[in-house]
């Protein structure tokens, strides 16, 4: 197997056309990929139209790149366009059978563990319940046959991944972004987000650390057909803590029953989806709207970048650089179970949540920048935003 990196150009574009003007908005974006030992960012930018009243880039508590933005004046649309060139080096674990027994990892992460390493303490953040992942006996019961005594932890995780792949059906209509994992377990249907949450819940129920990974998966068009701009989708998978291995965290994709390698591009990691939603925040106004989402993953060593993806969004134009479909196109057959609907569902949740980033500019400062003839209405708006800002982010 060659160690040559595989290079990609990825464009993820989202558009909102609001039913009525949005007078105030604060948002948190997870659209920039994180640098990993096997993943290097050659070029990356996030363009936003209209231009935000303020913008700040930084890191979230999990080390992911994050962008905070706010709008203090009325606007009728929002376009977000993340474009990146990225190189992914082969990084499959050499021998998962040599990973430590799963019980030893469980004991290492236990409350009374002695002298934990800093890596172990960090992994403990992914050991407990989170917004979308509850720890239930039913999950432990489902996973226990994959973890007989003394089985290496990565072999157990691989067996659990294969079990989910075999017993569950990919069905974008079966669940929503908020469907509990016990309901997913009962229905045996869902999408990549559901399967990732389920596998994470099973591992945590056994006392093991597991985290949620968001990113992109390369899909290939049918033979003889061109790559369709916007026909790819966001994807989600799982990372399992296996100390003393070549990489302490090893990824598993239960949707496709494989260990992610050079065809998976990582954007962010968190306890579950709510930590790393591509767009999350609050708006005042806007009415009802459906997001339009287009994702295009181009392998640079095999194809040229489509011309329509090379030019950034023009600020103030209100125009995207690609025609965004009302519904995502179906992924290519080679990844038939990839998350065709996750992009839309991600943004549906972002629209409904009333949670503001912790590091937003204060509402009082925001009001100073709003036109004086609208002060009365906007003081009321500020009160709403201030109340929402008091809700802690997951």
Where are these regions (language model features)?
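Flexible, active-site-adjacent loop/turn segments at secondary-structure boundaries
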Residues: 16, 20, 29, 46, ...
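Intrinsically disordered, low-complexity N-terminal segments that are enriched in acidic
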Residues: 1-113
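Hydrophobic/aromatic-rich core segments of domains that either
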Residues: 162, 194-289
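Short capping/connector residues at structural and topological boundaries
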Residues: 23, 27, 36, 51-53, ...
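C-terminal accessory extensions/subdomains outside the catalytic/core fold
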Residues: 251-253, 257-354, 359, 363, ...
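Secondary-structure boundary elements
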Residues: 86, 104-190, 271-273, 303, ...
């Amino acid at each position: 197997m060659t160690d040559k990196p595989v290079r990609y150009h990825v464009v993820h574009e989202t558009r909102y056309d609001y039913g009525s003007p949005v007078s105030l908005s604060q948002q948190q974006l997870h659209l920039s990929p994180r640098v990993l030992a096997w993943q290097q960012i050659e070029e990356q930018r996030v363009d936003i139209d209209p231009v935000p009243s303020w913008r700040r880039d930084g890191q979230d508590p999990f080390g992911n790149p994050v962008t905070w933005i706010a709008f203090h004046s009325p606007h009728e649309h929002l376009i977000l366009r993340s474009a990146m060139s990225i190189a992914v080096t082969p990084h499959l674990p050499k021998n998962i059978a040599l990973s430590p027994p799963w019980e030893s990892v469980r004991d290492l992460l236990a409350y009374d563990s002695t002298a934990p390493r800093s890596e172990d303490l960090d992994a403990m953040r992914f050991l407990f319940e989170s917004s979308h992942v509850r720890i239930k006996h039913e999950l432990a019961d489902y996973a226990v046959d994959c973890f007989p005594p003394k089985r290496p932890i990565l072999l157990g995780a691989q067996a659990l991944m294969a079990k989910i792949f075999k017993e569950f059906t990919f069905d974008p209509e079966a669940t929503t972004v908020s469907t509990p994992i016990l309901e997913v377990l009962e229905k045996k249907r869902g999408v990549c987000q559901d399967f990732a949450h389920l596998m994470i819940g099973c591992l945590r129920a056994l006392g093991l650390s597991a985290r949620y990974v968001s990113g992109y998966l390369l899909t290939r068009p049918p033979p003889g057909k061109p790559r369709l701009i916007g026909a790819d989708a966001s994807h989600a998978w799982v990372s399992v803590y296996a100390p003393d291995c070549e990489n302490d965290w090893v990824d598993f994709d239960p949707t496709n029953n494989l260990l992610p390698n050079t065809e998976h591009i990582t954007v962010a990691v968190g306890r579950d989806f709510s930590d790393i939603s591509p767009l999350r925040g609050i708006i005042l106004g806007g009415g009802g709207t459906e997001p339009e989402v287009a994702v295009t993953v181009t392998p640079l060593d095999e194809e040229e970048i489509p011309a329509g993806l090379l030019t950034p969004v023009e600020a103030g134009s209100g125009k995207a650089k690609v025609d965004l479909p009302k519904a995502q196109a179906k992924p290519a057959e080679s990844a038939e179970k990839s998350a065709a609907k996750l992009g839309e569902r991600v943004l549906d949740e972002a629209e409904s949540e009333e949670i503001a980033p912790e590091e937003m500019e204060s509402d009082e400062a925001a009001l100073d920048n709003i036109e004086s003839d609208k002060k009365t209405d906007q003081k009321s708006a500020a009160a709403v935003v201030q109340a929402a800002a008091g809700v802690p982010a997951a």
